[in-house]
Amino acid sequence: MKIDLNADLGEGCASDSALLQLVSSANIACGFHAGDAVLMQQCVREALKNGVAIGAHPSFPDRENFGRTAMQLPPETVYAQVLYQIGALAAIVHAQGGELRHVKPHGMLYNQAAKEPPLADAIARAVRDADADLVLVGLAGSELIRAGQHYQLTTRQEVFADRGYQADGSLVPRSQPGALIESEEQALAQTLEMVQHNRVRSLSGEWAHVKAETVCLHGDGAHALDFARRLRAAFAGRNIDVSADLE
């Protein structure tokens, strides 16, 4: 059994270099919510050194609120912004002899695209037009995954180790109680349940179906590295290989 393990990088976290030794995929901020050209270059260099698959992490233009503010932008505006961010990172990756592998939207762009078909469509079109061989990463079972499949992109369905889930398989909004799982034991158990059995216990107590192809690790928590090491050990003990290549 294989699972991809991804982390968002280039967002100003001191643990980026250490985290790159534990994950198989890196989503690099493209300047709209965090990062800049120099930091993008540094992250790409580190990812290539560690053999980690590189992906673009585009966002709404919202540096002030770290890309977590809801926005109602015309789909064509979102299309252009996502295409722009993918292109910027792709150029940096190619200049260093690497290959851009995937795209995963950030923050509120990710959350809104999970539920809003026009937004999901704009993102999927941008990915296709940038490079039809790119993998589109989105919340498991979401509109973004469906849009990617519509455009015949390879999609990767994502689950979260440290986020609470609702009965429909969506994430509990960060503004609500239960959005973040603080207990490492609970996060570990939830992740193994999702990866091995494709289900997650929702806040209401019901099981929600989720297809786990990649697990997101947040690198900004106080114990992020310890948790990543524990998760890798748990996977190894269950013969689950961590790899960006799931085929």
Swiss-Prot record:
It catalyses: 5-oxo-L-proline + ATP + 2 H2O = L-glutamate + ADP + phosphate + H(+). Keywords: ATP-binding, Hydrolase, Nucleotide-binding. Pfam families: LamB_YcsF. InterPro entries: Glyco_hydro/deAcase_b/a-brl, LamB/YcsF/PxpA-like. It is an enzyme of class 3 (hydrolase). One of its GO terms (molecular function) is 5-oxoprolinase (ATP-hydrolyzing) activity. One of its GO terms (biological process) is carbohydrate metabolic process. It comes from the Bacteria. Its EC number is 3.5.2.9. Catalyzes the cleavage of 5-oxoproline to form L-glutamate coupled to the hydrolysis of ATP to ADP and inorganic phosphate. Belongs to the LamB/PxpA family. Forms a complex composed of PxpA, PxpB and PxpC. NCBIfam families: PRK05406.1-1 (NF003812), PRK05406.1-3 (NF003814), PRK05406.1-4 (NF003815), PRK05406.1-5 (NF003816). This is 5-oxoprolinase subunit A. It comes from Klebsiella pneumoniae subsp. pneumoniae (strain ATCC 700721 / MGH 78578). The lineage of its organism: Bacteria, Pseudomonadati, Pseudomonadota, Gammaproteobacteria, Enterobacterales.
